[in-house]
């Protein structure tokens, strides 16, 4: 991977910054320098974020959004890099709050990412690879064969993190080196063998589990479970076979007992059925005898009474119809007589009316000729009425046409006047219409103003604003610095005073300590006196107090040193702030002059529209008003065009209407002339009204005559029909009366004959009628017959049962039922026992079969498991004493090449032949994850030691050597990742002059075929490296980037 071009927008301190790595190809190494906090490491953060969505430090990607970014400013990073022969472009933006595209307020925009192959920087996209963060991350890992952490360990060495690869654990190193050197085939093979070993172990565990489950199955009773538990593993199969055979023997024994009990059940069932049948016969005999007593003997009197009454009913029943007919005929005969009398009376009245109507008809016949003559006159008048109506209709039409003609002439004059007005209006509007070229020119002028305003004035105004904001910020910082400097001076004076006081106390305590050590007769080491008069006043606590005071003096001295250093820094910062403030004021003045000149040119021709001095809001509003004014003028012009088109359309319509109305006037004259000629030709002068009145009078007389005649004829016809009907009805009633009298006489004779019979039960008509009409005849007859049948049946059934149970004793059914119940229960118990025994046999048989199957399969897989286990132990390091895995062994080979290259080209040179790398012999506590631990062999001590024991400068030298060697070895490896860039963030300040010079030589050596970038504040490196990227602070948290090529 080789960086080509990096663009940062509102990312950290970079508002719109670009790093073009193509400009840095002339020299093996380039330097990134700038003020502290200016954003040097942010360049590395941007590359890491673009590729992996993370930064080099602990900051989240969202926190990299510039603090000065507004809701309209979108944070994004665009990074171009080469991989092989292809140029890739990756664009990424973090989650951020941005202004809504529509309406007010903001919206949370999710993180985005896009990866594509392009033809050149800022060029055409050739292939779109991924368009979301997840897919982009997967594609980058596939392309580089590195994740973010591994990228930072071998390509990007962040600040204060050089020793991460050097001191990382074997698993971490192994993951990185496997990706770099493409040794995943060994990982895949190891994983496959591991999976097969795990699979085979799982299979064997399943075999053991299945066998154990079978031995501990719930089918075994506690005694059998105990036997299986105590038995040796190799004896358990034989024991299960023996237990199965025991169960078979128990089952056969229970089967024999069940068969014997089944025969007993059959025998007792036969005996029970016989006893039950005999008991039923005794019960039936008792029931039949009870029925005979209740239904035959006790009901015999009722039977005799019913028999006697039945004879009377049967005697009277044949006369039932005759009695009914006799009564109906007598009643009907009376009604017929009344009808005959009524018809005779009504017929006499109708005959008188018929004679009267006949005389009236003869009078009407004499008036008929006069009426017919009037009808003929009326017909002639009807023809005259039709002609008169035609004349009146034509006269009315003439009047209507004259009125319509008058209206038509009025409208014609009105349309002619409107036509003249329309022509006048059209002429006026044609003068008011503005050409389209006028508006095109006006819009171009307005757009040019907008372009000048947005493209020149606002950017210049923003420069003025930012400069003034920077001046305010610098003045505030200068003020804060002055306050802090004053406070620091006060603190320094206080610290000096306290320090001097503590020194006095120390002298006092040291004198006291010296006094305490003096011995009588020995000379004082200070004055040489042999007498020591004040030693008895020394306190024992002085020693402890002196120790504490010495600590306080040391702390006070450190504090004083810190304050002095801070005072120096504040003084330096004050000078820098004053210088920056002066420069900013000059810059602001220049920007204001530039803005003034540009604005004067801007309003030269538009002073009446825009304000005298630059005001962004007012200018924006003026431009908007100018746009609205132009739009309003254009709308009015469009409305005028529409009105003109409408008027021209109306003029054409009016011209057509004038023609139509002139033609209509001519047509009216022609129609009126035609109608007057037709009226003269008809020649009728009397009105239709008078003619209709004459005809109506004649027709009314004729209608009244015909109506009277018609009504008279109808009355004659009705009365004749009525008299005829009355004659027929009278004949019918007379015949009916004769028939009824004849039938009444016959029925009376029948009843009289019945009463005269010798066996007659009565001679009273009413009693006979009651018996004949009694509806209980059938019911009483059925009761009598049922009684006879029941009596005969019961006698036969009682006799039959008595014959069956003759000489037999009634059985004790309860005793037999109890015996039957006990026999059945014993049989059911034995059946259940047999089923249980059969189940136990089948279960034991199933267990035995399954055991044999599992053991057979286990024996079959034994050789396969042994081979896989041996292979797995070999590749996982379990078979060797060093416990080195196959994957680690392969990667260790590459690491040895890296260490050998580092020893030969870098570490010896940088450490003056003192150090060299070697692999650790074994891991701590013989752990499994070792094999890639790196030790440092010290030629001065003749012993190897851990990399953790190196100092800061030594650690940097060692880490740099490995990083450089790794880059070289990978470049020379066919399957390795192509590493065409190396970036180092700080660390050179810990090297002495000689080591620094050697490190520079090493960097230049590897920089011959790849890009090497260094961040450093070391002055020697600034002076030595010609190609530089300089990052300057601009105030307000902003920084800019400048490339320097020497």
From Swiss-Prot:
GO annotation terms (biological process): DNA recombination; DNA replication; double-strand break repair
Entry's transmembrane regions: none
CDD domains, sorted: ABC_sbcCD
Gene Ontology molecular function terms on file: ATP binding; ATP hydrolysis activity; endonuclease activity; exonuclease activity
Entries under InterPro entries matching the protein: P-loop_NTPase (IPR027417), Rad50/SbcC_AAA (IPR038729)
Domain of life of the source: Bacteria
SUPFAM superfamilies in the record: P-loop containing nucleoside triphosphate hydrolases
Pfam families membership: AAA_23, SbcC_Walker_B
Positions that bind ATP: 34-41
Gene3D superfamilies: P-loop containing nucleotide triphosphate hydrolases
Residues forming coiled coils: 223-239, 268-432, 468-505, 543-867
Entry keywords, A to Z: ATP-binding, Coiled coil, DNA recombination, DNA replication, Endonuclease, Exonuclease, Hydrolase, Nuclease, Nucleotide-binding
Sequence similarity: Belongs to the SMC family. SbcC subfamily.
Oligomer status and interactors: Heterodimer of SbcC and SbcD.
Summary of the function given for this chain in its UniProt record: SbcCD cleaves DNA hairpin structures. These structures can inhibit DNA replication and are intermediates in certain DNA recombination reactions. The complex acts as a 3'->5' double strand exonuclease that can open hairpins. It also has a 5' single-strand endonuclease activity.
Protein's UniProt name: Nuclease SbcCD subunit C
């Amino acid at each position: 991977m080789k960086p080509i071009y990096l663009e940062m927008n509102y990312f950290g301190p970079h508002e719109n910054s670009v790093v073009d790595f193509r400009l840095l190809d002339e020299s093996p190494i380039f330097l990134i320098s700038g003020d502290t906090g200016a954003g040097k490491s942010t360049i590395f953060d941007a590359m890491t974020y673009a590729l992996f969505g993370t930064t080099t430090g602990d900051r989240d990607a969202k926190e990299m959004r510039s603090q000065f970014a507004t809701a309209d400013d979108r944070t994004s990073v665009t990074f171009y890099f080469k991989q092989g022969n292809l140029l890739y472009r990756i664009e990424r933006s973090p989650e951020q709050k941005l202004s809504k595209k529509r309406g007010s307020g903001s919206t949370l925009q999710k993180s985005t990412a896009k990866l594509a192959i392009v033809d050149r920087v800022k060029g055409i996209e050739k292939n779109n690879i991924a368009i979301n963060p997840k897919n982009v991350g997967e594609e980058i890992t596939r392309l580089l064969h590195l994740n973010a952490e591994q990228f930072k360990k071998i390509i990007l060495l962040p600040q204060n993190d050089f020793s991460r690869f050097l001191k990382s654990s074997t698993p971490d190193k192994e993951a990185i080196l496997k990706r770099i050197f493409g040794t995943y085939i060994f990982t895949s093979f190891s994983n496959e063998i591991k999976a097969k070993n795990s699979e085979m172990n799982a299979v064997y565990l399943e075999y053991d589990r299945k066998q154990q489950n079978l031995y501990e199955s719930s089918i075994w009773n506690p005694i059998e479970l105990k036997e299986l538990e105590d038995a040796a593993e190799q004896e358990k199969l034989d024991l299960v076979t023996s237990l199965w055979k025991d169960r078979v023997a128990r089952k056969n024994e229970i089967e024999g007992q069940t068969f014997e009990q089944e025969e007993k059940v059959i025998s007792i069932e036969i005996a029970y059925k016989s006893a039950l049948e005999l008991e039923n016969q005794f019960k039936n005999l008792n029931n039949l005898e009870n029925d005979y007593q209740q239904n035959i003997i006790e009901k015999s009197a009722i039977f005799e009474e019913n028999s006697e009454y039945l004879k009377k009913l049967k005697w009277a029943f044949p006369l039932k119809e005759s009695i009914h007919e006799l009564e109906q005929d007598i009643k009907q005969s009376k009604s017929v007589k009344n009808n005959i009398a009524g018809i005779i009376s009504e017929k006499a009245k109708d005959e008188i009316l018929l004679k009267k109507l006949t005389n009236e008809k003869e009078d009407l016949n004499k008036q008929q000729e006069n009426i017919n003559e009037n009808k003929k006159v009326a017909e002639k008048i009807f023809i005259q009425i039709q002609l008169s109506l035609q004349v009146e209709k034509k006269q009315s039409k003439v009047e209507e046409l004259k009125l319509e003609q008058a209206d038509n002439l009025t409208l014609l004059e009105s349309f002619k006047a409107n036509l003249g007005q329309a022509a006048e209006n059209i002429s006026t509007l044609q003068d008011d219409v503005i050409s389209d070229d006028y508006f095109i020119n006006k819009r171009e002028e307005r757009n040019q103003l907008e372009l000048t305003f947005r493209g020149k004035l606002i950017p210049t105004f923003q420069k003025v604003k930012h400069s003034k904001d920077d001046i305010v910020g610098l003045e505030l910082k200068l003020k804060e610095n002055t306050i802090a400097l004053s406070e620091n001076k006060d603190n320094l004076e206080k610290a000096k005073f306290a320090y001097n006081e503590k020194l006095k106390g120390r002298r006092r305590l040291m004198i006291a300590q010296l006094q305490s050590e003096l011995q009588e007769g020995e000379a004082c080491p200070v004055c040489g006196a042999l007498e020591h008069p004040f030693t008895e006043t020394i306190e024992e606590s002085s020693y402890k107090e002196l120790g504490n005071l010495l600590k306080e003096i040391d702390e006070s001295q450190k504090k004083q040193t810190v304050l002095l250093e801070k005072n120096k820094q504040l003084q330096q910062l004050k000078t820098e702030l004053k210088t920056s403030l002066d420069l900013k004021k000059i810059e602001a003045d220049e920007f204001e002059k530039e803005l003034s000149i540009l604005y004067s040119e801007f309003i030269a021709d538009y002073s009446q529209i825009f304000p005298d001095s630059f005001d962004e809001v007012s200018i924006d509003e003026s431009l908007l008003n100018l746009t609205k004014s132009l739009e309003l003028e254009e709308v009015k012009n469009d409305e005028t065009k529409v009105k003109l088109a409408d008027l021209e359309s109306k003029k054409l319509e009016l011209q057509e209407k004038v023609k139509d109305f002139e033609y209509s006037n001519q047509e009216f004259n022609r129609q009126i002339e035609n109608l007057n000629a037709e009226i003269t030709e008809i020649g009728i002068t009397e009105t239709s009204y008078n003619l209709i009145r004459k005809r109506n009078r004649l027709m009314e007389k004729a209608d009244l005559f015909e109506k009277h005649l018609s009504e008279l004829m109808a009355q004659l016809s009705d009365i004749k029909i009525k008299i005829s009907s009355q004659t027929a009805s009278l004949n019918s009633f007379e015949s009916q009366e004769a028939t009824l009298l004849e039938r009444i006489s016959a029925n009376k004779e029948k009843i009289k004959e019945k009463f005269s019979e010798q066996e007659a039960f009565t001679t009273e008509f009413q009693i006979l009628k009651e018996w004949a009409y009694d509806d209980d005849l059938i019911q009483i007859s059925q009761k009598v017959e049922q009684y006879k049948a029941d009596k005969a049946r019961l006698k036969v059934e009682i006799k039959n049962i008595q014959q069956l149970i003759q000489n037999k004793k009634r059985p004790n059914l309860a005793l037999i039922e109890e015996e039957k119940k006990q026999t059945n229960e014993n049989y059911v118990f034995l059946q259940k026992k047999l089923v249980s025994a059969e189940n136990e046999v089948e279960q034991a048989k199933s267990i035995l079969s399954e055991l044999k199957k599992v053991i057979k399969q286990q024996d079959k897989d034994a050789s396969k498991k042994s081979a896989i286990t041996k292979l797995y132990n070999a590749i996982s390091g379990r078979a060797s004493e060093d416990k080195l895995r196959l994957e680690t062994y392969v990667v260790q080979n590459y690491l040895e090449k890296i260490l050998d290259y580092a020893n030969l080209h870098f570490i010896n040179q940088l450490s003056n032949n003192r150090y060299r790398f070697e692999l650790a012999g074994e891991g701590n506590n013989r752990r499994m994850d070792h094999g890639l631990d790196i030790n440092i062999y010290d030629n001065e001590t003749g012993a190897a030691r851990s990399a953790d024991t190196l100092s800061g400068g030594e650690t940097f030298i060692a880490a740099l050597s490995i990083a450089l060697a790794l880059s070289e070895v990978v470049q020379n490896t066919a399957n390795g990742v192509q590493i065409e860039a190396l970036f180092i963030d700080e660390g050179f300040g810990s090297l002495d002059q000689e080591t620094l010079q050697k490190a520079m030589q090493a960097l230049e050596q590897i920089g011959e075929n790849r890009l090497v970038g260094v961040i450093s504040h070391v002055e020697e490196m600034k002076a030595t490296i010609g190609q530089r990227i300089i990052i300057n602070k601009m105030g307000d948290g902003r920084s800019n980037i400048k490339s320097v090529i020497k």
